[in-house]
Amino acid sequence: IDLDRFDIRTKISEDIYYFANDMENVSSIFSYFFLKKYYITDYKIQKNHGFKLHSKIRTFDEIKSPPFENEWGWYSTDIPPYYWLKDCKKEEFLCIVRDIYNNKFIFSSDYQQIFDNVNVINEKINNFIALHIRGGDIVYSSLRKHAGRKVLEERFFPYEIALEIIKRHTNANVKIIIFGQDVKSNMKLLNYIIENKILPKNKIFTVDEFINQTFNIFERTFFEMNLMSHALKIYTPGIQAQKSAFSQCAMMIAGRKNIISYHEIFSLKQQYQIIKSNLGLLGLDSLYDSMAYFQLYKLSRILNLTLDLSLNYIKKAMELDQDNDAWGIHYIYCCFLLGDLEAIETFLKVLLDSNKLNNLLQTFIISKSMRIYKEQEDCFISFRSTKIYPMINYVGIWLNYHYGEFVRMYKMYKNYQKYFNDLEVDTQCFFSCYQKKDLISNSAVLIVKNHLSYKLGKILLECKNLKDFVEIPIIIKYFLWESKNEKAYFKSFLFEIEKLDDYNQSCSIRNYLSYQLGKLIIESFKGWYKGYLLLLPYRAFILYRKIKKDKR
């Protein structure tokens, strides 16, 4: 449900049969007595991942006594308390949660019936391991464009890895049940196992073989989670504490540690070899194969394999998912590493000519301040070359502008201004007060970065050579003029910076050396008649030493 903004929807067609997340009415799930005692309807309690609660090791007394995160208490977290709560013993915690969950008064009659049916089915199956395969929620939604976001990469469970786990259980005296929302892909895995005589049909199943087909999506989910809890082992994606919340919930229902991540079984080198060997065997949707090639690309970089090999993998990923601009970003990055600037320039020009460049640019900033593509962006943001690459510089200008690095943006623009006319790209938008207002109005960080103090400090700190020093008066003159114009234009607009989500982050920017140095310069010019300008070099040196000391 927390990923609903990524348009993860149920998809049923000739080729795809995938169930997305869904939520049932609370009164349909829980009993009247349970809701009366525990249900909170206060609209002031917003969605929250509980990051603050598990941000440090705490004690029982600490979380029971004020000050709390909010006046009413704490937001809960999906990270189990034995990771962050002192003296919380794992085995004891799991047993307590299991006993609470098994209370007959929690669920409505319909859901209690599902709960009871699961117990009957489990007795018939007897001794099974579960493969909890996640992937459809990523490959069938815009999440696949967030390929750099660690938590999403950790949630993905490649079918190629699942196949290998099954192969390693051929001689085990247990049954295997394949769990997951992608019904068709699960069936393809099952059929491959049976047709290739890896396991007989009475040894391996998909969870759909046990599900009442009249269930709605949430009832299916409830059934799956409860059946999964009975598994001897649950193979899941995820690293360390950040495993799938679905699998972890099944573990808590079980009251024992029965989940194991495939990362704990296979080294990165083994994962690379397994995906490479099994890719294409199951006849999965091309989006899965594209993701598998991206996994090979990512692993090849971690394992320090050749750049040419990495480039080949990301090209194959692009061929199979042509709408995924995340792959384009990684292709460009690989070309940067290879020093093939001509290939990057050509690729960007093709996107421009086909009106697809903006899609790539928006994918760069898709995670906003999290900057999941920071490593790739930095190649553009700090780009310097003696040769002429207008497209690369245009992307650098665009990124600097959208991240509030207006000084760097202006300098890149001045150096390449005469080349942009031939490209037919709009560069005037970077100098429009109207466009600037729209850019910064929803970000406290960008508002602060647009302060003259920050920009003046950046002008001095970003001087890298003699040419930069010579241009200082010209650049300062421009930003003084810009500041005057924007001050007049923004006068009629109210920026309620304290109410913006990134306000706390913006406060830290005010303490940056660049901001403090710019502020000192402005104060010195305002107090020139008191001799402040003469003291400026000394005061700047003292400021530098103070900030450097504070960083330690």
Q: Where are the predicted features?
A:
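Catalytic donor nucleotide-activated moiety binding site of glycosyltransferases and closely related
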Residues: 132-134, 163-217
